[in-house]
Each structure stands twice: as structure tokens, then as C-alpha cells.
Amino acid sequence: VGNMLDIPDNDQRAISMAIECIHAYSLVHDDLPAMDDDELRRGQPTAHIVFDEATALLAGDVLQTLAFEIFSAEIPTFAPFNEVIASKLLAVFAPRARRMVAGQMLDLNAEASTDISQTDLESIHRDKTGALIEAALLMGGICAGATAPQRMALQDCAQHIGLAFQVQDDILDVTGNTDDLGKPVGSDEKLDKSTYVKLMGVDAAKDYAQSLFAEGRGAITRELGDDNAVLAVIEWLWQRQK
């Protein structure tokens, strides 16, 4: 988003670092035995397998804290920013990091549920998966001085892409293979998780993912045109096999 709106790469680095710290910590914790109990992540042994459970837990804690340290120490030093903009960025970032955790809690509570609806699943994944994507797009928009309609378009796009990513993840957990995914297939079924595939079947889930990606594209093109980096990322996500 920053590139699309003419913010130099170096001036986006601190924000990217903060987002990646939150993302990485969420994956380290998500893999723990108390949660998804996964032994592979991106084709490599997970943190609690390489080290131990306590070390993985603390590593995640440090990454979360580091994200906010970057906000206080790094972000105000970059050219486009001042304390007012840094405060606006934090007001976007912090609640969405919290929503990500809330979504994970709801996801864990939904395991083995026999009566979860599509609306319930979407509510979970707007927080668990979509919130951090929403933060990334909105923060790029804020840094670049995006207009209110442009920020609304970025938020709308993020909400659709976040859901689409999760639907696609559910599909790949059934149709993919461990070598491509870099993590074990069938882990959702093993944990009896509530998924879009479980709810509607593979074919309907594929159609739903396609419609969500289309909505995300539409939100961006309406305000930001049809030649931009966000559309390229959306296309990559749609084609991904891992």
C-alpha cells in the first residue's frame, strides 16, 4: 500500500517490522501443544520442537513486546512520521492485535462444535485472520495520507481477503500436501476444527473463496485503480498452494 501511494520502502520498514513481530508471535503460539499442536511450519520444525515449549512461549511473548517497542522507538524517527501519525498508527494496530487473539480464542472454543454457522465462522476469522491484514493495509494508507474513501476501500478489501485466505487455508488442509504447504495436512480434521470445508464442502468453499477474492479486488479498484501492488498480492494469494 505504501509503494502504491508513493512512500519509500525504507520509510515503511518499521511498520512492517512491527506487523511481522505480531504475526510471527501468533504463529509460534498457534503451533504450541495447547493450541494446534503442529510440528512443522513452513517446512521447518516448529519452535517448541526445536527448543522446548517454555522457550517457544517466551519467544512469542518477546516478539509481541518488541512490536510495541518498535512503535515507541523506531516509527517516530522515520521521515513521513511524527508523534501524531505514530499515535494514529498505534490506534489501528493495537486493537487489531487484540482482535487476532480474541479470534484465536473463539476458534479454539469452536472445536468439535456441531452447530456452528457460516456467520459464526466469518466472525471468528474476521478477527483471527483478517484483523492483522486490516492493520497492515490501513497503516500503509495512513502513512501515505490516503483519503477517507481510500481508507474505507482498504479496510473493505482486507476484510474480504482475510476471509478468503482462511477459506483457502481450510481447502488446502484437505486438498494440499505436506511438502507444498510446509505443515501437516489434515490438522484441522485431527483437531475436529470448524472449517468452511466441513460446513459447505470443498467445491462450495472454492466458489466462496473466489467470490471473496473478487470482492477484495473490487474494493481496491474502485478507489485506487486497477494497476497497483495490492492487486498483485491478491492474485498471488489466490494462486497460492501453501
Language-model features and meaning:
Residues 1-221, 225-238:
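Mg2+-dependent prenyl diphosphate-binding active-site environment of isoprenoid biosynthetic enzymes
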